[in-house]
Amino acid sequence: MLAAEATVVPRETPRRRPWLTRSAVAWFAVAALGQLAFVYFIVAFYGTRTAGSDYAGWNDKPLIEGYVAGDSIGNLMFIAHVLLAAVITLGGLHQLIPAIRNRWPVSHRVVGRSFVLVAYFMAFSGLWLVWVRGTQLSPVSAIPTSVNALLLLWFVTAAWFLAMRGRHAQHRRWALRAFIVANGVWFFRIGIMAWVLINRGPVGMNATLSGPADITLSFGSFLVPLALLELYFVAQRSGAGHWRRAAVGGLLAGTAVTAIGVFGTIAFMWAPYL
């Protein structure tokens, strides 16, 4: 979420704000591991079934019905949305690594433009799947998905606009916001599993994702990371120690929850279907 922002002015020095940078890098390391596992699952589950023309096999994973007999357009839109989730996840990780951005700026620009195009498709296709095709568990669960999609359109547009005008520090901030909401599905899944493991069961959840915990996690999966990101920005700009301590504490707590969620999704949500 924040590792790339260490290069945004004002720069952090080892003596001034070591824990702020270290906590951001710690979160990014855990998140990158979880996102690579997510990409692997998409390729291993959906990619292999699609390559083998086993389209009905998309439904081997319960809850969402991806394949619907006779719905060629809907099926195509669904699998394009799912497979491009792997692309946008890898693209986001690529963009957040400062060494790549600094050493291969052309690659950063090309991947960045591709990220914007894929993000537009993901947002519009997600809205279409939810509200036109009806790929949802309940209207309640569709609302946060739609809010996330609209935020993605806003953030990637702002990031692209600022990049085109050479306002790089502002561009990176909006790009980080776009990274958060572009990974809303991933955040939601690790949030679910962290909640289940911490509470030793699906407290406040139901099969249609309309329980109180479901709704809270649906919105919180992107609003909480965005809030932590904004807190990090404030801590970077401010010389006040209380902002830095708050940001470090939030990031360390976020890292712990992310680690629990990553473990849960790999062990219980993805591995059983591979």
Residue ranges and their predicted role:
Residues 2-274:
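Alpha-helical membrane insertion/targeting regions
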